[in-house]
Amino acid sequence: MLEKQNSEENIELLRAMRYCYNKSKIFYAVRISISILIPILSISIYLFNRGSTGTSNTGVWFSVIGSIWLLIAYQIEKLEGGYIEKGAKIQEKFDINLFNIRWNNVLVGNQISPEDIRDFSSKFKGDEEKLKNWYGGLSSKHFYVNVILAQRSNLMWAISLKRNFSILLFTVSVLYLFLTIAFGFFVNMSMQEYIIKILLPSMSILIYGFKTSDELKKQSNKLEALGNSIISKFDTGNLSEINASACREYQDAIFVYNRIRSILIPEWLYWLRQQKDDEKMIQINIRLTKKSNLF
């Protein structure tokens, strides 16, 4: 299995997968950047006009812009989700190639065409070396033990990223809300001014922050429960339960909770933790592999 993951066909799948996820992150970056820019501009213009004796409807216009942007951001999020779905299906194909389990057409749907995979792969501009040896530390004499440990790696790697990003989003969102309220008191804003000039223009980014933080927390808890259920099989020695059918069930959960509903994590956070999390995952896989070889 480990040798097969570096075959030309499977590396092409990983290249295509990476391209799709990177493309979705471009839409994500645009969506978040503009959502942040709108309230910043609203506050800046308010400060600029603060000493003016005339009246200004700028705050009202930014409230309108913020409301319209919510609708535009929703459409951008749909484009973002389309590339996430393509990337998830291509990653599913990669796993199916390695794990010797069937494609779940009912859950996953149709496969991405070979032509689209080739097209996406050719557009990938990243470092191909980082795609090699996708799964590590697997040397059990039981094939499906290697499979389920690879699946657990997918689950546990995601938990670390999701929890850290969830905490970051919640902290920043709460901090932003309190700072803007404090700013309103400091400049003696009325409640109406605060709502029109700060809160309404900020709604898209605040909704994203709190909603995404909550969703990431729920996903990480679900993934942790799945990961722990795999560990329990090793603790009890019930390796006979680890077969193609069981692995397909875990693969379904990975697709639902960790891929198709995936919330994009910033690239810098992903690479910041990659080496540390990879090393930890490989060591755990080696330990569990040795344990499985005793049976």
UniProtKB/Swiss-Prot annotation:
Please tell me where this protein is predominantly located. membrane
User: GO cellular component annotations, sorted alphabetically?
Assistant: plasma membrane
Q: Which Pfam families match?
A: S_4TM
The residues forming the signal peptide are none
Query: Which terms under GO biological process does the entry name?
Result: defense response to virus
Alphabetically sorted, this entry's keywords are: Antiviral defense, Cell membrane, Membrane, Transmembrane, Transmembrane helix
Q: What induces it?
A: Part of the CBASS operon consisting of cdnD-IK1_05631.
List localization entries.
Answer: Cell membrane
Q: What is the protein's membrane topology class?
A: Multi-pass membrane protein
Q: Write out the transmembrane intervals.
A: 26-46, 56-76, 167-187, 190-210
* Cross-referenced InterPro entries: IK1_05631-like
Query: What does it do?
Result: Effector protein of a CBASS antiviral system. CBASS (cyclic oligonucleotide-based antiphage signaling system) provides immunity against bacteriophage. The CD-NTase protein synthesizes cyclic nucleotides in response to infection; these serve as specific second messenger signals. The signals activate a diverse range of effectors, leading to bacterial cell death and thus abortive phage infection. A type I-B CBASS system.
- Spell out the protein name for this chain: Probable CBASS effector molecule IK1_05631
